[in-house]
Amino acid sequence: TSPSANVIAWPGATDGHHSVYNKQNPLLADLSVNQKITGRNSSKDVRHIEISLAGSGLSYQPGDALGVYFLNDSALVRDLLLLTAISRDTPVQLAGETFTIEQALTEQLELTQSYPAFVEKYAAATHNAALTELVADKAALRAYLSERQIIDIVRDHPGLLSAQQLVDALRKQQPRLYSIASSQAEVEDEVHLTVAVVRYDAYGQPHLGGASGFLAERLNEGDKVKVFVEQNNNFRLPANDDT
């Protein structure tokens, strides 16, 4: 999918500052402000997001990022289960734990970014000759995956597979990193983000980015969101103001 311009990944980035909260143990924080800052007639949807870090001990510096864990859209999960004729209560195994397929698709697995490994595994599970042929042509596969989410592939090539086969074909969801748009010296126990919502129409269907759609469309002010600070040691302002 088309990535948000302010979702970032830094080489050499490390976990945040002195706090019990990190990528493996994120803070369940309050989303305090979700404000659209683009005009009514703008083709872009950009949000000013404020999240409370009160009592967490989390701190950040210029150049750091906020990692955001998100839930996939329940409507997207429902449609995927309908297309694959899988009951939402079907138990599946994921990383040694048991979930219902609905839980796994909502909380654990990547649905809004497509990738070659999914096509390969889905083609094998559904015995789809056309997809198997596509997998062999890397350039054609890259072109096919452009702007397609997982559900687009399944919609294009419907087939029967088990709930466990679907889970095994999907990769683990990764938190999205957003550049922090605030100075902690000014906002203290808050963190501010400027989030460009990934939203586009393709193949006859509306599409939303996973994390940006979650923050903009599915979280209300006062709702909880799991976050952590990702420190960027490659970007630091000089300690001396005269530098």
Residue locations for each model-derived region?
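FNR-like FAD-binding dehydrogenase module
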Residues: 1-243
